[in-house]
């Protein structure tokens, strides 16, 4: 037997940052090395995402248990992969995909396949005595490593908050800095400054799932205004040091072909009108990126949005592309969007995640590696962002250990690699 052979695979039910069960997997090698990883879980999900297998037994965890997925790892996946070399990442992932046999991994569960896929990469890296980011880089011959620009979600509306703001996330991107550590510091300072701005206005400063504030503001523009005040208060310049980014998650307020904004007095917009509304915000404020500006099925609307904003700012497809290379290819062919959000639990294996990242890069699309609203202490996405030189990472606000664990891992990686932080160079329209 060779030392890199997988001798055991074990999974267990653990809790995520929302107190819901998720799955953690261990891949154990002949050498005694153990690789471990956890699957995250989303709140606003695209309809074409790979399936997260839940038990549905209402008497346990309100139906959200993952014992079935755990059992799938401990039986089917165990049988499939024990005896294989851990260094064959693609072959391991392809075995799980073929065994599952469904388009959306509904047989094994994408949470089961992903946890094992990532745990295998952790084990392989440890076996080769390599940091995970370097192992991931080697998988696709990525020779340049870069530190990602963080897209920091500091103010929430939509499905992530109980308020009247329609846009789901208002984020800051600290682009005018020369290192990740400095960019992180700027983000943290703005986060603390925003807290004091909200406090002064008598607004709620409790934080949501991703660590962002969710005050009861009256409109989307009011949310932008308080962030700009916070940036100014810290002494940074909005538009040069720090840019704004939005995640509209507009599928959440798209009904019968109309975009209905409750926060704007139940105003309804056609696709083109809503795209024009977003273009108006871009004109008025230092916004560099808009995610899911239109509904995931509104390809015509997306096409129009891309035609008016695509050469000025980053237009990110999340629910639109769901980290799926096939769907991304359609976007490339139809010139829809210019960026993809990468959430590996939307697709269910590391190999397919890398396929999506490199397909995007080959076609001039930017890539943003992302957490989910239900996270764990697992910081694999930090290594993924550096190891693929993705350029950006979206991993929440500047509080809650489930978010900060990723930032801290990036600080360690920067210290180790001295990888370049490209800041503004990552964006169209800023160069």
Swiss-Prot record:
Superkingdom assignment: Bacteria
UniProtKB keywords: Cytoplasm, Glycolysis, Lyase, Magnesium, Metal-binding, Secreted
GO cellular component: cell surface; extracellular region; phosphopyruvate hydratase complex
Location relative to the cell: Cytoplasm; Secreted; Cell surface
Chain sites annotated for binding (2R)-2-phosphoglycerate: 168, 343, 372-373, 394
Cofactor binding note of this UniProt entry: Binds a second Mg(2+) ion via substrate during catalysis.
InterPro entries the record matches: Enolase (IPR000941), Enolase-like_C_sf (IPR036849), Enolase-like_N (IPR029017), Enolase_C (IPR020810), Enolase_CS (IPR020809), Enolase_N (IPR020811)
PROSITE patterns on file: ENOLASE (PS00164)
Pfam families in UniProt: Enolase_C, Enolase_N
Pathway named in the protein's UniProt entry: Carbohydrate degradation; glycolysis; pyruvate from D-glyceraldehyde 3-phosphate: step 4/5
A Gene Ontology BP annotation from the UniProt entry: glycolytic process
EC number of this enzyme: 4.2.1.11
Cofactor needs: Mg(2+)
Residues annotated as the enzyme's active site: 210, 343
NCBIfam families: eno (TIGR01060)
Family, per entry: Belongs to the enolase family.
PANTHER family (UniProt xref): ENOLASE
Listed name of the protein: Enolase
Organism: Acinetobacter baumannii (strain AYE)
